[in-house]
């Protein structure tokens, strides 16, 4: 299965039990910042934004004082899982990033999608990739 298929069929799909509700944007990005696959709506990000995200996975709490920036959008960092998941909030939307062995799985959402739904979609795919050694 291609990386783009994972984004299209597992991240940008309807959320279980909520037909028509889906993430706003999604991507799979290598630890080096190279995009493996992305939705058409995923923001163009700067290398320093990806560096900050990778630093936070290695040094949890790094982004808390400044916020998480992606594509020029600032998210307030909220509770996540140290070294495994970063979650951010901005207004009625937010972001979930799950770290796997080789990549980061991104999901960005706006209402009516809830933070919990975004977490479920992103973390399920990330956990699957971890189980596969990816």
UniProtKB/Swiss-Prot annotation:
Going by the UniProt record, its keywords in alphabetical order are:
Actin-binding, Allergen, Cytoplasm, Cytoskeleton, Disulfide bond, Phosphoprotein
Enumerate the Gene3D superfamilies for this protein. Dynein light chain 2a, cytoplasmic
Main function: Binds to actin and affects the structure of the cytoskeleton. At high concentrations, profilin prevents the polymerization of actin, whereas it enhances it at low concentrations.
Q: How does it assemble?
A: Occurs in many kinds of cells as a complex with monomeric actin in a 1:1 ratio.
Q: What is this protein called?
A: Profilin-3
Q: Which domain of life is it from?
A: Eukaryota
The family note in this entry says: Belongs to the profilin family.
Give start-end ranges for motif Involved in PIP2 interaction.
84-100
The subcellular localization recorded is: Cytoplasm, Cytoskeleton
For this protein, the record's InterPro entries field holds: PFN, PFN_euk, PFN_sf, Profilin_CS
Post-translational modification, briefly?
Phosphorylated by MAP kinases.
**Cystine crosslinks:** 13-118
Which organism encodes this protein? Olea europaea (Common olive)
Task: State any further remark.
Answer: The variability of the residues taking part of IgE-binding epitopes might be responsible of the difference in cross-reactivity among olive pollen cultivars, and between distantly related pollen species, leading to a variable range of allergy reactions among atopic patients.
The Phosphothreonine modification is found at 114
Q: Which GO terms describe its cellular component?
A: cell cortex; cytoskeleton
One example GO MF annotation: actin monomer binding
Q: Which PANTHER family match?
A: PROFILIN, PROFILIN-5
Chief location of this protein within or outside the cell: cytoplasm
Q: What is the lineage of its organism?
A: Eukaryota, Viridiplantae, Streptophyta, Embryophyta, Tracheophyta
Q: Name one Pfam family in it.
A: Profilin
